[in-house]
A protein has these predicted regions:
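Beta1-alpha1 glycine-rich phosphate/pyrophosphate-binding loop at the start
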Residues: 1-77, 166-189
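FAD-binding core/adjacent interface of flavoenzyme oxidoreductases
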Residues: 1-4, 64-153, 225-241
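Glycine-rich Rossmann-fold phosphate-binding loop(s) that bind the pyrophosphate
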Residues: 7-10, 133-134, 157-159
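Short glycine-/acidic-enriched loop or helix-start segments at secondary-structure transitions
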Residues: 15-16, 40, 85, 119-121, ...
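Short, glycine/charged-enriched secondary-structure capping and boundary segments
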Residues: 18-21, 43-46, 89-90, 122-126, ...
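A Rossmann-like FAD-binding core segment of flavoenzymes
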Residues: 25-27, 69, 75-96, 103, ...
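Rossmann-like NAD(P)H-binding beta-loop-alpha module
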Residues: 140-189, 223
Length: 241
């Protein structure tokens, strides 16, 4: 049996390993468009904050180690661009050289993951505006900080990754503000638990602007202006969505 898996991060890598345990003879190939497999998003902010200093510690497996352990072909920098169910093939693009080829399969598993949503707002796409979801995103933010030494940052969103990033940017000495439309951080939490998080963040000098909608961004000579609905705008050297 020949199995193709689209996506090689958490879900795809787990599925591949599980199939190998069930069938030691299956031919398993995983196509991953990024350069990394099997990494944990929650560790990314700690590389930005210099808690993790070795980038290799961000990944649990490499294509080489995965093959050695499971005999699974991990093809990084390969993007599945179309699926042909009638003939059981996929079209794959090698992102390193542009080559496009077809690969046949008996079983196909889709685990492409997700991309961070960039709101359709004025100013999205300016150089000082970042997203944080992948290892590549992490390196871009780290490189920007090392090169430009920003003193302030605005984080749009107060979920798990947002709070970890706020912690690490604050530890780097930056002035950090979290802005979001919900009136509490960590929306799934009960209000009394969220209140404890609010107090802890403020105790460490992190500003919270809650209950306000971001309407756009303006690039300024000294940073980025974040436009808010029904509230004065905020300004910082960089913004992370």
């Amino acid at each position: 049996m020949k199995v193709i898996i689209v996506g090689g991060v958490a879900g795809g890598a787990t599925a591949a390993a599980r199939i190998r345990r069930l069938d030691e003879h299956a031919e398993i190939t995983v196509f991953e468009r990024s350069g990394y497999i099997s990494y944990a998003n929650c560790g990314l902010p700690y590389y930005i904050g210099d808690v993790i200093t070795d980038p290799e510690e961000l990944t649990l497996q490499t294509p080489e180690s995965f093959f050695k352990r499971f005999r699974i072909n991990m093809k990084i920098h390969h993007e599945v661009i179309s699926i042909h169910p009638d003939r059981k093939t996929v079209s794959v693009k090698n992102l390193e050289n542009g080559e496009i080829f077809e690969e046949n399969y008996d079983k196909l598993i889709l685990s492409p993951g997700a991309k961070p949503t960039q709101p359709r707002l004025p100013g999205v796409g300016i150089d000082e505006l970042f997203t944080l979801r992948t290892v590549e995103d992490t390196f871009r933010i780290k490189e920007y900080i090392n090169k430009n030494h920003p003193k302030s940052a605005i984080l749009a969103g107060g979920g798990f990754i947002g709070l970890e990033l706020a912690e690490n940017l604050r530890e780097l000495g930056m002035d950090v503000t979290i802005v979001q439309r919900p009136k509490q951080l960590m929306n799934p939490f009960d209000p009394d638990m969220a209140s404890m998080i609010h107090n802890e963040m403020r105790k460490h000098g992190i500003k919270l602007v809650l209950g306000y909608t971001v309407e756009g961004f303006k690039e300024k000579d000294n940073g980025v202006e974040v436009l808010l609905k029904d509230n004065p705008s905020l300004q910082a050297d960089m913004v992370v969505l």
